[in-house]
Swiss-Prot record:
<dbReference type="GO" id="GO:0008104">
    <property type="term" value="P:protein localization"/>
</dbReference>
<dbReference type="InterPro" id="IPR036390">
    <property type="entry name" value="WH_DNA-bd_sf"/>
</dbReference>
<dbReference type="GO" id="GO:0030238">
    <property type="term" value="P:male sex determination"/>
</dbReference>
<dbReference type="Pfam" id="PF00888">
    <property type="entry name" value="Cullin"/>
</dbReference>
<dbReference type="GO" id="GO:0031145">
    <property type="term" value="P:anaphase-promoting complex-dependent catabolic process"/>
</dbReference>
<dbReference type="GO" id="GO:0019100">
    <property type="term" value="P:male germ-line sex determination"/>
</dbReference>
<dbReference type="GO" id="GO:0019102">
    <property type="term" value="P:male somatic sex determination"/>
</dbReference>
<dbReference type="GO" id="GO:0030261">
    <property type="term" value="P:chromosome condensation"/>
</dbReference>
<keyword id="KW-0226">DNA condensation</keyword>
<comment type="subunit">
    <text>Component of multiple CBC (Cul2-ElonginB-ElonginC) E3 ubiquitin-protein ligase complexes formed of cul-2, elb-1, elc-1, rbx-1 and a variable substrate recognition component. Component of the CBC(fem-1) E3 ubiquitin-protein ligase complex with fem-1, fem-2 and fem-3. The CBC(fem-1) complex interacts with tra-1 and promotes tra-1 degradation. Probable component of the CBC(lrr-1) E3 ubiquitin-protein ligase complex incuding cul-2, elb-1, elc-1, rbx-1 and lrr-1.</text>
</comment>
<feature type="domain" description="Cullin neddylation">
    <location>
        <begin position="722"/>
        <end position="784"/>
    </location>
</feature>
<keyword id="KW-0132">Cell division</keyword>
<dbReference type="GO" id="GO:0042078">
    <property type="term" value="P:germ-line stem cell division"/>
</dbReference>
<dbReference type="GO" id="GO:0030674">
    <property type="term" value="F:protein-macromolecule adaptor activity"/>
</dbReference>
<keyword id="KW-0833">Ubl conjugation pathway</keyword>
<protein>
    <recommendedName>
        <fullName>Cullin-2</fullName>
    </recommendedName>
</protein>
<dbReference type="Pfam" id="PF10557">
    <property type="entry name" value="Cullin_Nedd8"/>
</dbReference>
Length: 791
């Protein structure tokens, strides 16, 4: 029997044309007597020769095309009766089998019958094509005989017919016994008593699907025999899947209750993960692929979803204690559950924010910006690693981490109206990009700039950062204290990637101005050289001039300030440029206006510096100082001692700024004064015995009042005004596009447009809308909370 089965499982050779295709008269009974035994042999997988196969194939063809009337329908009915008789015999055989051997015997019978049905289907291929398919088409032709068609029994192709008979006449009679034995086998597998008939269990279960195959004409790829055939799972689902799911739910519900009683939460989670993995492997081993997800979802429902409150109850402690292993297990279990992670995400977010606020509170010392950035980065790196390792970079936890750090970075200190993060980050980057004795490699510098961008993305008031950063960049560029122009450009490109071109457009123009200024200075030097060629006695102090666009640089000339509260502007309003600088300044103005007629130059003497060579001392020193300091020191060219007020009258500087200027010169001991407190009546002397370890040194800029606080106030005022203009422009752009818009919709679009620069509050938005209504850019409509654009 084994030998014959092995032979019959090979695909039979395709029939060759060995017979006449011409229709002829056929004696049905005579042909059928010879055909019927072959059907039984084939369906039992008994071997037949090629000649026999071709003869039987020819017999089927002859019957289907016989004259004067084709005998297809009679052949179909006889084949059906033959298969029914065969299946009834098999049913009797299986009924008599020992119950303990039922699965094995059924599986053996099924394998033979299923394979035999496939070959029978091929043998009767012409009958399927000529009778079955044509009958279906003609019965439905134009729906003319639709009512009659409803009374005709379903005509199936031979392969489908054989499986239908198997299902109806055999399987359904023993289905309860089969299902019971299958469930027992799976239950034993769950308990560790692995059945020795695993292949038979899987084969019987999948027979419930295969017996509903509908397409026997598909030729599967080699190594994937018959898997490509279409089938439905209705019978499988109703007869086996339903009882299986019921049994599974009962089993794991009871098991979950027992484990919760006997195990800790940590142990419970570990055990559930193991059970889920085992059940998934078991489902893939035994069940149809459509059942795998259903079984796992059901297990998750009874072991996780039903008890998620118990898991949530310990979540706070696990996160607070940073029990990463348990948290990873909890994440794996709750991830597939709808809204299962909400509590974990909330606890994670709150814990990160708590640790972050602790890290940035009570910062003291001179390096607060560096402490702030490094502490925030420490928190970010720690919990970003935790998010990756524990929560698999899950989007919900990424969002929670971002919200937490946004809350940390934008937190306000007591008594502060705006967060300090923007200023601190700007000062931190200023420290990185300034020349210093502690050099960084290009790789280290870029890594630190990348870290700064991480924090920058969390800052809500990006416009405040922009103001501070542009001021500090301007100082670096003017004073030539940048570590390198490549590093400056690298940072600007990173800001551009984070916020777009508009955010960095002014910063880029500052770079352009520096390049153009260098070219202009070179041309001016050539111009001076040409003058000296003609007039050798003319003396010009060597200079390097920067031409800076007023709209791009965050700089102001104090002498032109219209702010009545600006005391510095009043103190330097009548400043007299030193005579030694006047020729070159006048010549440069003449040179520049000759090339750029119509442009106006405003000198920023408060930012202008020069080198003064000191030749009256034992050694020749070079002091780098600001123009106001230079003017004051030059007063001592003809005198050794002068009253402070006389210096002020001579250089045109007065008030507190004059005192600050003199004090900076006293600080480096170029001048001396006997008075403890410097006043306008104090007498200052030139220090003829001054010494310094450095041959070249720099004087500090005069500090007017509290410079940092003044800078913060100036930035706050500028930002407030810029926000007002930006907000009004955004509203006008939106309304010009929309024409008519509801209040809430307008607020939403405003928030979306401004989020890249700052986060406006609702009162500020409302005030901006009211201002535009007064200016008649928009108006209210007759509808409630609706605005209309006015062209």
């Amino acid at each position: 029997m084994a030998s014959s089965t092995k032979v019959s499982l090979r695909r039979p050779p395709r029939p060759q044309v060995m017979y006449s295709l011409k229709p002829k008269v056929v004696e049905f009974d005579k042909v059928w007597v010879q055909l019927r035994p072959s059907i039984i042999d084939i369906i039992n997988l008994r071997p037949i020769t090629n000649v026999q196969w071709h003869h039987k194939f020819s017999d089927v063809y002859d019957i289907c095309v016989s004259i004067p009337t084709p005998l297809s329908e009679r052949l179909y009915n006889e084949v059906k009766a033959c298969i029914q008789e065969h299946v009834r015999q098999k049913r009797q055989d299986i009924v008599d089998v020992d119950p303990d051997l039922l699965l094995q015997e059924y599986h053996k019978m099924w394998r033979v019958f299923h394979e035999g049905a496939i070959f029978i289907h091929r043998l009767f291929g012409y009958l399927n094509k000529q009778f079955v398919k044509q009958k279906r088409c003609t019965d439905l032709d134009n729906f003319a005989q639709y009512a009659a068609f409803l009374q005709i029994p379903d005509v199936k192709e031979i392969g489908c017919l054989a499986l239908e008979i198997w299902k109806e006449d055999l399987v359904k009679t023993i289905l309860p016994q089969l299902v019971k034995l299958l469930l027992i086998a799976i239950d034993n597998d769950r308990k560790g008593n692995f059945p020795h008939i695993a292949n038979e269990v899987s084969g019987v279960i999948n027979s419930f699907v295969k017996m509903e195959e509908t397409d026997f004409d598909v030729v599967p790829a080699e190594g994937a025999r018959y898997k490509a055939r279409e089938s439905t799972t209705a019978f499988y689902q109703e007869s086996f899947e339903k009882p299986l799911l019921t049994d599974t739910e009962q089993y794991y519900s009871a098991l979950a209750q027992k484990m919760l009683t006997d195990l800790s939460c940590s142990e419970y989670m570990e055990q559930v993960i193991v059970l889920l993995e085992q059940e998934e492997m078991r489902a893939k081993k035994y069940l149809h692929e459509s059942s795998v997800e259903k079984v796992i979802t059901l297990c998750q429902k009874v072991m996780i979803k039903a008890h998620k409150d118990k898991l949530h109850a310990v979540c706070h402690d696990l996160i607070t204690n940073e029990e990463n292993k348990d948290l990873r297990n909890m994440y794996r279990l709750l991830k597939p559950i709808q809204a299962g992670l909400s509590v974990m995400v909330k606890e994670f977010e709150e814990y990160v924010k708590k640790k972050g606020l602790e890290a940035v509170s009570r910062l003291t010392g001179e390096n607060v910006p560096q402490q702030f950035v490094e502490n925030v980065l420490r928190v970010y790196n720690k919990f970003n690693d935790m998010k990756t390792a524990v929560f698999m970079d899950d989007g919900e936890f990424s969002s929670g981490l971002d919200k937490a750090l946004q809350g940390v970075v934008n937190s306000k200190e007591p008594g502060q109206s705006v967060p300090k993060a923007s200023e601190r980050l700007a000062r931190y980057t200023d420290g990185l990009l300034k020349k210093s004795t502690k050099g960084l490699s290009e790789t280290d510098l870029e890594a630190k700039l990348d870290s700064a961008i991480v924090i920058f993305r969390y800052i809500e008031d990006k416009d405040i950062f922009q103001k501070f950063y542009s001021k500090m960049l301007a100082n670096r560029l003017i004073a030539s204290t940048s570590i390198s122009m490549d590093a400056e450009e690298l940072m600007i490109n990173k800001l551009k990637q984070a916020c777009g071109y508009e955010f960095t457009s002014k910063l880029s123009r500052m770079f352009t101005d520096i390049g153009l200024s260098q070219e202009l200075s070179n041309n001016f030097d050539k111009h001076i050289a040409d003058i000296k060629t003609v007039q050798p006695d003319v003396k010009f102090v060597p200079t390097q001039t920067m031409i800076l666009q007023a709209g791009s640089w965050p700089l102001n000339a104090p002498q032109l300030s219209t702010n009545s509260n600006n005391q510095t502007a009043q103190d330097v309003a009548n400043f007299h440029l030193p005579r030694i600088l006047q020729p070159v300044i006048q010549e440069f103005e003449k040179f520049y206006t000759g090339k750029h007629n119509g442009r106006k130059l405003t000198w920023l003497f408060n930012m202008s510096q020069g080198d003064v060579r000191l030749t009256y001392l034992d050694k020749q020193y070079v002091a780098q100082m600001y123009v106001y300091q230079m003017a004051a020191l030059l007063c001592f060219e003809r005198r050794d001692a002068i009253l402070v007020k006389d210096i002020g009258e001579e250089i045109g500087v007065s008030g507190d700024y004059l005192l600050k200027t003199i004090r900076t010169i006293l600080d480096v001991t170029l001048l001396t004064c006997d008075d403890q407190n410097l006043t306008a009546d104090s007498l200052v002397r030139l220090n003829m015995s001054m010494t310094s370890k450095r041959m070249k040194f720099r004087l500090q800029a005069p500090q007017v009042n509290k410079a940092v606080e003044k800078e913060q106030e100036a930035v706050a005022n500028t930002v407030s005004q810029d926000r007002k203009y930006y907000m009004e422009c955004a509203i006008v752009r939106i309304m010009k596009t929309r024409k008519v818009l509801k209040h809430n919709a307008l607020v939403t679009e405003i928030m979306d447009q401004t989020k890249g620069r700052f986060s406006p509050d609702v009162p500020f938005i409302k005030k901006s809308i009211e201002d535009l209504i007064e200016k008649m850019y928009i108006q209210r409509t007759d509808q409630n909370d609706e605005y209309q654009y006015l062209a």
